[in-house]
C-alpha cells in the first residue's frame, strides 16, 4: 500500500467513525397540547418523523451519561453540546432542570449549539429536555426532528480530517506535487531504514 493510499484509508476511517458517533439513542417523547407531560406518558423515540397537527407540542428528553471516551478520544474536560436540525417554531431547552435556551420562533440550535457541560465529567448524567410548539399556521401531517448530543473533541477531529483532506486536494493540484511526495517518501523510508 502506498503512502497516499494509506493516508486516504485512514482519513476515510476517521471520517466514518465521526459520522457514526451516537448519543446513545435513548431519547423519549410525548406529543400533546402543551401541558407538562406525566412521567408515564413518555415513549421511546424510534424515528425522526412525528405525526402532528397545528398547536401540538413535542416534548423530547434524555438522560445522557457522559462516556469515558467518544470515538476513541478522552471526553473528560471536553465540552458536551446539544444540536439539532432547524425547527421553525417556538422552542425551549432545559439542562439538568435549568432553562438554558428559549425562543418564541425559529429554533435553530445547529450553530450556535446549546452547552450541556462546559467540562465533561465521565459518568455524570445530564437530563436534557426539549419543548417544541408547532406554529399556528402549520400545515402537513407531521414533521422531522432529530436532536443529538455531541463532544467537542469529536467535532474538532472531524474538522481536522475534513480540512486536511481539502489541503491534500489542493496540494495535488499544484505542479510538481507527485515529485515532491516521492522525495518525501524516499526520505522517510531512508530514515526508517536507519
List each model region and its residues:
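Solvent-exposed strand-to-loop "edge" motifs in beta-rich extracellular domains
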Residues: 65-67, 85-87, 133
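N-terminal regions that are enriched for targeting/export leaders
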Residues: 32-50, 59, 80, 84-87, ...
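Extended carbohydrate-recognition surfaces in non-catalytic/accessory domains of CAZymes
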Residues: 1-76
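Short alpha-helical segments and helix-capping/turn motifs at coil-helix boundaries
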Residues: 65-69, 78-79, 111-116
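Beta-strand-rich ligand-recognition modules
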Residues: 92-145
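Generic N-terminal low-complexity/basic-hydrophobic segments
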Residues: 1-27, 154-191
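Aromatic-lined ligand-binding clefts that engage carbohydrates, nucleic acids, or primary amines
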Residues: 71-97, 128
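Glycine/proline-rich low-complexity spacer/linker segments in large multi-domain proteins
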Residues: 96-102, 133-174
